[in-house]
Amino acid sequence: MPKEVYFNKPQRLTQLIGANISVIVAGRRTGKTDSIAAPFVLRNMQRMPGSTGGIVVPTFKHGLTNTLPGLFAAWKRWGYIRGIHYVIGRKPPKTFAKAIIEPAEYEHVISFYNGSCAVIISQDRPGSSNSLTLSWLLVDEAKFIDYNKLKDETLPANGGIKSYFGRHSCNHSIMILSDMPQTQKGSWFLHYKDKMDSEVISAIEGLVYDIWKLKERIKQYKESGEEVSKHLIYSLRHKDKQLNQLRSIATYYKEYSSIENLQLLGENYIRQMKRDLTPLTFQTSILCQRIGIAKDGFYSSMKEAHKYDASDMEYLDNVAQSYYEDDDTHLSSICSHMDSRADKDTDPNAPICIGMDYNANINWIVAGQPSGRRLNVIKSFYVKF
């Protein structure tokens, strides 16, 4: 018996449009990973059996604690069980079909029963997209993605295998997800808005509606025991072909605030976020508003050179491996291990220096450890009035 699944408006539209390139800039808790990324990955792995795709995350830690839990939780609700329909981090069982291009190693690979694979590509792990031949890409938390690395290392790998999947509109497809960036470097994906052809998107919307009407007519004929005319079947096939062609050239760009998911979040969530977050973070991460960068502030003077990633890959790999080996382990258990041990810049034997900043509207504490002429800020806290 079919199971009803709820999707909000942004989630439904993204799936129905099905553009080859989709860029969704949406506020927190709009279900980007759960109900936009998860259907995208599942669709590609199902429609292109034996293909290989890439899930690009800014850091491996982020992938373990944010992206993968959202994907797996959604798949589980839809009946896809880890250990039965897919495995992660190990060679798939012999009952699974083989990938067209089998991975050299399966350490950070999701393997589906039909031979499809998804490689976890983390930008803080050098060379994680080397020598890959990919048929699709999911780019999560795009505002934290280094575009130069993506452009030079990963996008060229999204060449796919045209001889197998050339007829599919989802071949070479790209899904980019993020909330609104606050920095110029993190804004690299906003230009896709100018690449979207509104007429193509409108034509896709019209075809989706026409196909739905045709399917409803065919359904009515079958329920009444009448023979379905060949004209209806031909029309359905013709429109399906048109839809596939338009989707294969389409770029879809949309911006949504968290209010789009108000039915599930409730008004209290929005009020709480306005109270707890800084005004800038609330504007970008909840309301999804584009902002200018202030020129007279201290933080706007900080450059990309002031930022760094310091993941302890050996520790994270051990945590991930313990999860990969046990299909019954929930990913939430990983979060309990994500403390200072996952940070390579933390010296457990050195003192921690604390700095405080008392302000009229917000109080800060930052904790760091000096290292020569460098100060590694390992944690920050704030409270608003």
How would you label these PLM feature ranges?
Residues 23-91:
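Conserved P-loop
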Residues 28, 122-124, 176-182:
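A short beta-strand-to-loop transition that corresponds to the Sensor-1 phosphate-sensing loop
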Residues 140-142:
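Walker B catalytic acidic pair
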Residues 332, 336-338, 345-348, 366-385:
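Nucleic-acid-processing active sites and adjacent nucleic-acid-binding tracks
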Residues 144-264:
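ASCE P-loop NTPase helicase motor core
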Residues 2-19:
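Pre-Walker A adenine-sensing motif
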Residues 64-133:
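Inter-Walker segment of RecA-like/P-loop motor cores
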Residues 248, 255-354:
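ATPase catalytic-site recognition across NTP-hydrolyzing enzymes
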